[in-house]
Amino acid sequence: MRIGSLGKRFGILLALFVLSSRGHGQVLIALLFGEKLNSGKLEFGLTGGLNLANISNIPDAKSRAGLNLGLFFNIKLNDNLYIHPEAIPKYPTGVSKVKPYSLNNPGLDSLLSSGDVTRKIKNITVPILVRYRLKGQLFAEAGPQIGLRTKAKDFFESGDLTYENDIEDHITRFDFGFALGLAQRLRKEPGAMALGIRYYFGVTDIDKFDEGSQKNNVWQINLSIPVGAGKQKQKAPAN
């Protein structure tokens, strides 16, 4: 399969995946296209797991946990080297337990001053990784990652009171950085699931106004599930 043809298919699938806002719609797309896309040198499937996100230079902030969901291609160059692009429409970042800041409303400021703030940022991300076999079915991976911010809100909580503040004007539309990690295939056979751990460190200052450089940092634990690869193996003619 040529890289140009693969790029077109990846772009079409990414657009469909993003437009399907609910998780079950994304799973359905993967099931519909998986069998047609998988081959001896190409795996396609779903990836999902846990994000543990933080933002640098926000005093006393704690990490924020959230679930990610996307699709992946695993393109075999040789037995040890792979190109591994992903499209992840559900990629949460942000922080929790931030000290309240002024909303320029004395009444609200007084009510919310004893609580804390959770910053929730929704993104679409596309990492383009190189995977190299270290030993057996254990792979190292590294590469660039670009993110598109879709929503950004701060949630103030003080006792039973909750207040939502839209901060999209404060957060950059795009984020760029690098990801590195390890991936362990659970079996040698085609179509095997893989369990991975990854760290993303952003190089973009995502806050347009606050002093200091605020950059995304995310730990990920993911499970990758090829779709249709097992059927392709069954259909392959015997040598």
Where in this protein do the model-derived segments appear?
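Flexible, solvent-exposed loop segments that connect beta-strands
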Residues: N57-D60, P92-K122, T150-F174, I206-G212, ...
